[in-house]
Design a protein with these regions (language model features):
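Juxtamembrane regions of bacterial inner-membrane/periplasmic proteins
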Residues: 2-239
Protein backbone atom coordinates (compact mmCIF):
# COMPACT_ATOMS: atom_id res chain seq x y z
CA UNK A 1 0.00 0.00 0.00
CA UNK A 2 2.75 2.41 0.97
CA UNK A 3 4.62 1.52 -2.22
CA UNK A 4 1.52 2.31 -4.26
CA UNK A 5 1.16 5.67 -2.50
CA UNK A 6 4.85 6.34 -3.03
CA UNK A 7 4.56 5.51 -6.73
CA UNK A 8 1.50 7.73 -7.00
CA UNK A 9 3.28 10.65 -5.36
CA UNK A 10 6.30 10.14 -7.59
CA UNK A 11 4.04 10.20 -10.66
CA UNK A 12 2.32 13.37 -9.46
CA UNK A 13 5.68 15.02 -8.86
CA UNK A 14 6.89 14.08 -12.35
CA UNK A 15 3.65 15.36 -13.87
CA UNK A 16 4.00 18.61 -11.92
CA UNK A 17 7.61 19.09 -13.03
CA UNK A 18 6.69 18.31 -16.64
CA UNK A 19 3.80 20.78 -16.61
CA UNK A 20 6.02 23.40 -15.01
CA UNK A 21 8.66 22.81 -17.67
CA UNK A 22 6.13 23.15 -20.49
CA UNK A 23 4.77 26.38 -19.00
CA UNK A 24 8.31 27.73 -18.66
CA UNK A 25 9.07 26.98 -22.32
CA UNK A 26 5.79 28.59 -23.43
CA UNK A 27 6.55 31.67 -21.33
CA UNK A 28 10.07 31.81 -22.74
CA UNK A 29 8.75 31.63 -26.31
CA UNK A 30 6.16 34.30 -25.48
CA UNK A 31 8.85 36.66 -24.20
CA UNK A 32 11.02 35.75 -27.18
CA UNK A 33 8.26 37.01 -29.48
CA UNK A 34 8.45 40.44 -27.85
CA UNK A 35 12.25 40.43 -27.88
CA UNK A 36 12.35 39.51 -31.59
CA UNK A 37 10.08 42.40 -32.51
CA UNK A 38 12.06 44.87 -30.42
CA UNK A 39 15.34 43.64 -31.91
CA UNK A 40 13.90 44.11 -35.41
CA UNK A 41 12.51 47.55 -34.61
CA UNK A 42 15.90 48.68 -33.36
CA UNK A 43 16.78 49.00 -37.04
CA UNK A 44 13.38 49.14 -38.78
CA UNK A 45 10.38 51.38 -38.20
CA UNK A 46 7.22 49.71 -36.82
CA UNK A 47 4.32 50.03 -39.23
CA UNK A 48 1.78 50.29 -36.43
CA UNK A 49 1.28 49.62 -32.72
CA UNK A 50 -1.25 47.81 -30.56
CA UNK A 51 -2.58 51.15 -29.34
CA UNK A 52 -2.89 52.58 -32.86
CA UNK A 53 -4.83 49.52 -34.03
CA UNK A 54 -7.17 49.76 -31.05
CA UNK A 55 -7.82 53.44 -31.82
CA UNK A 56 -8.48 52.68 -35.48
CA UNK A 57 -10.99 49.98 -34.55
CA UNK A 58 -12.90 52.43 -32.35
CA UNK A 59 -12.84 55.07 -35.09
CA UNK A 60 -14.20 52.59 -37.64
CA UNK A 61 -17.14 51.76 -35.41
CA UNK A 62 -18.40 55.25 -36.34
CA UNK A 63 -16.79 55.56 -39.77
CA UNK A 64 -15.83 52.33 -41.59
CA UNK A 65 -13.52 54.35 -43.87
CA UNK A 66 -11.63 56.07 -41.06
CA UNK A 67 -7.84 56.22 -41.35
CA UNK A 68 -5.02 57.18 -39.04
CA UNK A 69 -2.80 60.14 -39.85
CA UNK A 70 0.86 59.31 -39.36
CA UNK A 71 4.04 60.01 -41.28
CA UNK A 72 7.29 58.56 -39.99
CA UNK A 73 10.02 61.12 -39.40
CA UNK A 74 13.62 60.37 -38.52
CA UNK A 75 15.08 61.51 -35.21
CA UNK A 76 17.23 64.11 -36.97
CA UNK A 77 14.18 65.68 -38.64
CA UNK A 78 12.21 66.16 -35.43
CA UNK A 79 12.63 69.54 -33.76
CA UNK A 80 14.96 69.44 -30.77
CA UNK A 81 12.45 71.75 -29.11
CA UNK A 82 9.84 69.00 -29.24
CA UNK A 83 12.30 66.44 -27.89
CA UNK A 84 13.11 68.72 -24.96
CA UNK A 85 9.46 69.53 -24.32
CA UNK A 86 8.39 65.87 -24.29
CA UNK A 87 11.26 64.86 -22.00
CA UNK A 88 10.42 67.69 -19.58
CA UNK A 89 6.71 66.84 -19.61
CA UNK A 90 6.84 63.05 -19.58
CA UNK A 91 10.19 61.85 -18.23
CA UNK A 92 12.71 64.41 -16.97
CA UNK A 93 15.31 61.71 -16.17
CA UNK A 94 14.90 59.88 -19.48
CA UNK A 95 18.59 60.10 -20.42
CA UNK A 96 19.73 58.93 -16.98
CA UNK A 97 17.57 55.98 -15.90
CA UNK A 98 17.41 52.36 -17.07
CA UNK A 99 13.75 52.52 -18.07
CA UNK A 100 12.30 53.05 -14.59
CA UNK A 101 12.30 56.30 -12.63
CA UNK A 102 12.12 54.92 -9.11
CA UNK A 103 11.99 58.38 -7.51
CA UNK A 104 9.14 59.32 -9.83
CA UNK A 105 7.26 56.12 -9.00
CA UNK A 106 7.65 56.79 -5.27
CA UNK A 107 6.40 60.38 -5.64
CA UNK A 108 3.43 59.20 -7.71
CA UNK A 109 2.51 56.60 -5.07
CA UNK A 110 2.70 59.22 -2.32
CA UNK A 111 0.59 61.67 -4.31
CA UNK A 112 -2.04 59.02 -5.10
CA UNK A 113 -2.14 57.91 -1.46
CA UNK A 114 -2.57 61.50 -0.32
CA UNK A 115 -5.43 62.14 -2.76
CA UNK A 116 -7.03 58.75 -2.19
CA UNK A 117 -7.15 58.07 -5.92
CA UNK A 118 -4.87 57.71 -8.92
CA UNK A 119 -3.81 61.21 -9.98
CA UNK A 120 -0.22 60.48 -11.06
CA UNK A 121 1.38 57.58 -12.90
CA UNK A 122 5.13 57.91 -12.84
CA UNK A 123 5.56 55.99 -16.12
CA UNK A 124 8.71 56.72 -18.09
CA UNK A 125 8.88 57.25 -21.85
CA UNK A 126 10.21 53.69 -22.18
CA UNK A 127 7.29 52.29 -20.17
CA UNK A 128 4.78 54.28 -22.22
CA UNK A 129 6.36 53.00 -25.43
CA UNK A 130 6.16 49.41 -24.15
CA UNK A 131 2.41 49.86 -23.58
CA UNK A 132 1.81 51.58 -26.91
CA UNK A 133 3.71 49.00 -28.95
CA UNK A 134 2.30 45.80 -27.52
CA UNK A 135 -0.28 46.02 -24.74
CA UNK A 136 -3.98 46.68 -24.28
CA UNK A 137 -5.52 49.19 -21.90
CA UNK A 138 -6.28 46.41 -19.41
CA UNK A 139 -5.17 47.15 -15.86
CA UNK A 140 -3.85 44.07 -14.09
CA UNK A 141 -0.77 42.82 -12.28
CA UNK A 142 0.01 40.54 -15.23
CA UNK A 143 -0.04 43.46 -17.66
CA UNK A 144 2.11 45.63 -15.38
CA UNK A 145 4.58 42.77 -15.08
CA UNK A 146 4.68 42.31 -18.84
CA UNK A 147 5.12 46.06 -19.28
CA UNK A 148 8.16 45.95 -16.99
CA UNK A 149 9.72 43.08 -18.97
CA UNK A 150 9.15 44.82 -22.31
CA UNK A 151 10.55 48.07 -20.90
CA UNK A 152 13.69 46.21 -19.85
CA UNK A 153 13.97 44.68 -23.33
CA UNK A 154 13.64 48.12 -24.96
CA UNK A 155 16.43 49.50 -22.81
CA UNK A 156 18.71 46.53 -23.55
CA UNK A 157 18.08 46.23 -27.30
CA UNK A 158 17.73 49.92 -28.22
CA UNK A 159 19.63 53.07 -27.35
CA UNK A 160 17.85 56.07 -25.86
CA UNK A 161 17.80 57.96 -29.14
CA UNK A 162 15.95 55.13 -30.90
CA UNK A 163 13.47 54.76 -28.04
CA UNK A 164 12.66 58.47 -28.18
CA UNK A 165 12.46 58.42 -31.99
CA UNK A 166 9.88 55.63 -31.98
CA UNK A 167 7.95 57.22 -29.11
CA UNK A 168 7.69 60.55 -30.95
CA UNK A 169 6.45 58.77 -34.07
CA UNK A 170 3.72 56.68 -32.42
CA UNK A 171 2.46 58.98 -29.63
CA UNK A 172 -1.19 60.02 -29.94
CA UNK A 173 -1.88 63.74 -30.41
CA UNK A 174 -5.53 63.71 -31.42
CA UNK A 175 -8.27 61.49 -32.79
CA UNK A 176 -6.39 59.46 -35.38
CA UNK A 177 -3.38 61.79 -35.19
CA UNK A 178 -0.19 59.88 -34.40
CA UNK A 179 3.40 61.01 -34.37
CA UNK A 180 5.20 64.34 -34.36
CA UNK A 181 4.91 64.98 -38.11
CA UNK A 182 1.14 64.47 -38.24
CA UNK A 183 0.67 66.52 -35.05
CA UNK A 184 2.80 69.42 -36.30
CA UNK A 185 0.85 69.59 -39.55
CA UNK A 186 -2.53 69.06 -37.88
CA UNK A 187 -2.15 71.84 -35.31
CA UNK A 188 0.37 74.26 -36.84
CA UNK A 189 0.67 73.42 -40.54
CA UNK A 190 4.43 73.00 -40.23
CA UNK A 191 6.74 70.00 -40.34
CA UNK A 192 8.02 68.30 -37.20
CA UNK A 193 11.39 69.90 -37.93
CA UNK A 194 9.81 73.36 -38.03
CA UNK A 195 8.18 73.36 -34.59
CA UNK A 196 9.27 76.26 -32.39
CA UNK A 197 9.60 76.15 -28.60
CA UNK A 198 6.08 77.41 -27.84
CA UNK A 199 4.45 75.00 -30.28
CA UNK A 200 6.53 72.11 -28.95
CA UNK A 201 5.61 72.90 -25.35
CA UNK A 202 1.93 72.93 -26.21
CA UNK A 203 2.10 69.60 -28.02
CA UNK A 204 3.93 68.05 -25.08
CA UNK A 205 1.31 69.41 -22.69
CA UNK A 206 -1.40 67.63 -24.71
CA UNK A 207 0.11 64.15 -24.37
CA UNK A 208 -1.74 63.03 -21.21
CA UNK A 209 -5.18 63.79 -22.74
CA UNK A 210 -4.80 64.33 -26.49
CA UNK A 211 -8.44 63.71 -27.45
CA UNK A 212 -9.71 66.13 -24.80
CA UNK A 213 -7.23 68.89 -25.63
CA UNK A 214 -7.85 68.52 -29.35
CA UNK A 215 -11.45 69.54 -28.61
CA UNK A 216 -10.51 72.08 -25.92
CA UNK A 217 -7.51 73.90 -27.33
CA UNK A 218 -8.29 77.06 -25.35
CA UNK A 219 -8.13 75.23 -22.01
CA UNK A 220 -6.68 77.48 -19.31
CA UNK A 221 -4.92 74.52 -17.72
CA UNK A 222 -3.36 73.56 -21.06
CA UNK A 223 -2.04 77.09 -21.45
CA UNK A 224 -0.55 77.19 -17.95
CA UNK A 225 0.98 73.74 -18.28
CA UNK A 226 2.47 74.66 -21.66
CA UNK A 227 4.11 77.71 -20.10
CA UNK A 228 5.56 75.58 -17.30
CA UNK A 229 7.01 73.13 -19.82
CA UNK A 230 8.39 75.99 -21.91
CA UNK A 231 10.19 77.43 -18.89
CA UNK A 232 11.79 74.07 -18.04
CA UNK A 233 12.82 73.03 -21.55
CA UNK A 234 16.39 74.43 -21.36
CA UNK A 235 17.10 71.94 -18.55
CA UNK A 236 16.17 68.89 -20.65
CA UNK A 237 19.01 66.50 -21.45
CA UNK A 238 18.74 65.00 -24.93
CA UNK A 239 20.09 61.49 -25.60
Amino acid sequence: MFKAIKRGLAWLWKAFCYTLGVLFVVLLLYQGWFAAHIWYWAGHNPQSTSFMQARLERMREKDPKAKLRQQWTSYARISNELKRAVIVAEDAKFSEHDGFDWDGIQKALEKNQKRGKVVAGGSTISQQLAKNLFLSGEKSLWRKGQEAIITWMLEVLMDKERILEIYLNVAEWGNGVFGAEAAARHYYNVSAAGLNADQAARLAAMLPRPLYYERNRDSEFLQRYSETIRARMPSAQLP
